[in-house]
């Protein structure tokens, strides 16, 4: 599933081709995504794009009359293509833009979403979200205070969007490894010092992944069709049984909340 770095990579990739341009109309080949494509998108015409933003794992296209909210789901990606580029099997939505380009949404598993909101404050999918991990709101003190008396395992707790947004399965495993913290500890066991280190590593891992264009494990592509290169730098995720790059001990795998967690028991405590 695309996580924060992949969504931010998509945002940065599509922004130069959309802002200041006009969406002439939308082509929806299959409206049956996780939720049906909103009617307002089906009938969209001649709408200038004011900004391209991101909140958590949602892309937000600001138009004069409201917002298009895009979620990439499990396997979605956005590409900027020439208008004459023929659609393929899993190309479900196009936005046709005044500069001769199209923004094409591809999603083999159709678990993404294209929604409409009159304003972001009334959007159900954006309600109750925690702070952005790269913002000044996400501090060691915030994380420490939030973790008090929490018996939930720290790794699934970090993936809770009410705690902090956008830290999905890949980056929770990678950040905990970088901080030297075992993922099966209770969140409430975090110390002050560990909170400082964990917040710093989450920010560093996410920023480095964004610089590398995100992580491509299966379906994700950048807006120019290239894969994300952070997959080549993964320390633990997807490496069960392989030697740890720091100590040589085998990377272990466990199931936490039906998600695979990767860690090194020798380097993490």
Swiss-Prot record:
Self-association state and partner proteins as the record states: Monomer.
GO MF, one annotated term: damaged DNA binding
Organism name: Yersinia pestis
A Pfam family reported for this protein in Swiss-Prot or TrEMBL: Fapy_DNA_glyco
Binding-site list for DNA: 90, 109, 150
Reaction equation(s) it catalyzes: Hydrolysis of DNA containing ring-opened 7-methylguanine residues, releasing 2,6-diamino-4-hydroxy-5-(N-methyl)formamidopyrimidine; 2'-deoxyribonucleotide-(2'-deoxyribose 5'-phosphate)-2'-deoxyribonucleotide-DNA = a 3'-end 2'-deoxyribonucleotide-(2,3-dehydro-2,3-deoxyribose 5'-phosphate)-DNA + a 5'-end 5'-phospho-2'-deoxyribonucleoside-DNA + H(+)
Record keyword Transcription regulation present: no
An annotated GO BP: base-excision repair
Stated role: Involved in base excision repair of DNA damaged by oxidation or by mutagenic agents. Acts as a DNA glycosylase that recognizes and removes damaged bases. Has a preference for oxidized purines, such as 7,8-dihydro-8-oxoguanine (8-oxoG). Has AP (apurinic/apyrimidinic) lyase activity and introduces nicks in the DNA strand. Cleaves the DNA backbone by beta-delta elimination to generate a single-strand break at the site of the removed base with both 3'- and 5'-phosphates.
Mapped zinc finger ranges (FPG-type): 235-269
Membrane-spanning ranges: none
Disulfide bonds, paired cysteine numbers: none
InterPro entries in the record: DNA_glyclase/AP_lyase_DNA-bd, DNA_glyclase_Znf_dom_DNA_BS, Formamido-pyr_DNA_Glyclase, FPG_cat, MutM-like_N-ter, Ribosomal_uS13-like_H2TH, Znf_DNA_glyclase/AP_lyase, Znf_FPG/IleRS
Cofactor field: Zn(2+)
Keywords recorded for this protein, A-Z: DNA damage, DNA repair, DNA-binding, Glycosidase, Hydrolase, Lyase, Metal-binding, Multifunctional enzyme, Zinc, Zinc-finger
Protein's name in the database: Formamidopyrimidine-DNA glycosylase
Entry-linked HAMAP family: Fapy_DNA_glycosyl
Keyword Acyltransferase: no
The record's free-text note on cofactor binding: Binds 1 zinc ion per subunit.
EC number: 3.2.2.23, 4.2.99.18
Active site: 2 (schiff-base intermediate with dna), 3 (proton donor), 57 (proton donor), 259 (proton donor)
Similarity section: Belongs to the FPG family.
């Amino acid at each position: 599933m695309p996580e924060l770095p992949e969504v931010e990579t998509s945002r940065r990739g599509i922004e130069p081709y959309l802002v200041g341009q006009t969406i002439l109309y939308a082509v929806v080949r299959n409206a049956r995504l996780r939720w049906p494509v909103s009617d307002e998108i089906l009938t969209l015409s001649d709408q200038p794009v004011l900004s391209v933003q991101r909140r958590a794992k949602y892309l937000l296209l600001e138009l004069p009359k409201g917002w298009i909210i895009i979620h990439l789901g499990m396997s979605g990606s956005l590409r900027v293509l020439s208008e004459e580029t023929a659609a393929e099997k899993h190309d479900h939505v196009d936005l046709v833009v005044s500069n001769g380009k199209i923004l094409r949404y591809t999603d083999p598993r159709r678990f993404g979403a294209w929604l409409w909101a009159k304003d972001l404050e009334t959007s159900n999918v954006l309600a109750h979200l925690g702070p952005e991990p790269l913002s000044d709101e996400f501090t060691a003190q915030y994380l420490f205070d939030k973790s008090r008396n929490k018996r939930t395992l720290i790794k699934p707790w970090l993936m809770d969007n009410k705690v902090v947004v956008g830290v999905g399965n890949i980056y929770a495993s990678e950040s905990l490894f970088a901080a030297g913290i075992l993922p099966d500890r209770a969140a409430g066991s975090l110390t002050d010092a560990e909170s400082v280190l964990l917040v710093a590593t989450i920010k560093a891992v996410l920023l480095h992944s964004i610089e590398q264009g995100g992580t491509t494990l299966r379906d994700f592509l950048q807006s120019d069709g290239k894969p994300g290169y952070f997959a080549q730098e993964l320390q633990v995720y997807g490496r069960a049984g392989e030697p740890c790059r720091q100590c040589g001990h085998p990377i272990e795998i466990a199931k936490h909340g039906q998600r695979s967690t990767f860690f090194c028991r020798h380097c993490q405590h």
